[in-house]
Amino acid sequence: MDCKVVSLNEKDQFIPKIKSSDPVITGLFQYDAAQQTSFEKRMSKENNGREAALANVIREYMSDLKLSKLSSEQELNIQHLANGSKVVIGGQQAGLFGGPLYTFHKIFSIITLSKELTDTHKQQVVPVFWIAGEDHDFDEVNHTFVYNENHGSLHKVKYHTMEMPETTVSRYYPDKAELKQTLKTMFIHMKETVHTQGLLEICDRIIDQYDSWTDMFKALLHETFKAYGVLFIDAQFEPLRKMEAPMFKKILKKHQLLDDAFRATQQRTQNQGLNAMIQTDTNVHLFLHDENMRQLVSYDGKHFKLNKTDKTYIKEEIINIAENQPELFSNNVVTRPLMEEWLFNTVAFVGGPSEIKYWAELKDVFELFDVEMPIVMPRLRITYLNDRIEKLLSKYNIPLEKVLVDGVEGERSKFIREQASHQFIEKVEGMIEQQRRLNKDLLDEVAGNQNNINLVNKNNEIHIQQYDYLLKRYLLNIERENDISMKQFREIQETLHPMGGLQERIWNPLQILNDFGTDVFKPSTYPPLSYTFDHIIIKP
């Protein structure tokens, strides 16, 4: 597999500014992610004392992996964690069949950075992936997309439920027959390869052997990344929640100070010209599981109130729940990073472009709880380029970097005009210009008479519309005459810039596994990566 790094002319300059140590951006974080001294400081930080307990919890969480047991690399990393090794951590929602490709790329980011830190500092750093099983927005994880090569188009594949679950994703148990039907739909759209049957069997076995939504997600990730020694933990895992009880109590006691700190930091980021990323009305920033629903907690000055059942608690009652039933609580976007860092001895947190902006709004929250914000690193961004698409780019002389940023619409329109009669286009455009000049002359003739002005303008509008229609229909006919080329432009678009964004935000990992083999992401096949803020192109 070939691998190269390209620099894109990105519209969003947040990550390029992190790369260049822009003082406005670095001031939003505790550490400058582009400076080696930041890593030296984090590597030398004193541990919090929770590492042995965490190692036991992670071992328990991963003990139910049935398809294949823990790898020797994972066993070793659990031991390293118990002995005080620091971690590189990142997380993601449990998306259908692994979710978007960037989930895998986030894990590769964690693997790559932890290995580089281990090699540089001669201290073992453990890669940890945090499954956001506490989320309840099922609409965000119940679908994915598949590319149909025959049609040259993307198709949405969705797991359907009679009712949308309101509990956390970790507490959701999908209907296995319906999930297998969804999987079948996915594979119908994918081309048949020598890898298809084996991949389908792996997915079927995962559905057969696991029951909860997040356990199926965990099993797929484990099968893919076990050889790298990645450790997995679900935020909603009950033994982990019991460890979090002291922090839940602190959050409840300091909820107003926490909310004030968050709002103040968010306002500062807006004062620096950034858009507010975290949108929340709560002033407690926790959820409570009640009546099989994940419910947002707010405080009205006297009581803590749940948003779906209107149940209320006095302070002592809700703190008692945190003490004795912490598994009923879950964090929101503000408190999850805080809890994560309170638990782990983290060198760096790896996040997506939006995630790292969330963290920029939390600096004062960390300081309030005397928890230091780790280095916040943008994850690796990766695109897969197959031989066919590379040949099509060459055929139409389209720069890869341009497609990744802008898509192919500009190049497609240019191609259509090149196939058309230049004289025809020039004459129509000339008639449009002539009509505009004529309209100006007519308006001069009727100046001062509003009725006639309206008449002339309406007449001009009709003529311009007719000329526009003529030109558009002519170009549409040219487009239809070049239907093979149009399909090829669509192929490029759906592969490299699907739905107006990067491939990794839309494509599913099963597509890559089906095209290039079930070992494509394994250490024996996948190219060794170096951490970069630029874009990585991989040719399988």
Swiss-Prot record:
InterPro entries: Bacillithiol_biosynth_BshC, CC_BshC, Rossmann-like_BshC. One of its GO terms (molecular function) is ligase activity. The keyword Ligase applies. Its EC number is 6.-.-.-. Residues 425-453 form a coiled coil. It is an enzyme of class 6 (ligase). It comes from the Bacteria. Keywords: Coiled coil, Ligase. Involved in bacillithiol (BSH) biosynthesis. May catalyze the last step of the pathway, the addition of cysteine to glucosamine malate (GlcN-Mal) to generate BSH. Belongs to the BshC family. This is Putative cysteine ligase BshC. It comes from Staphylococcus aureus (strain NCTC 8325 / PS 47).
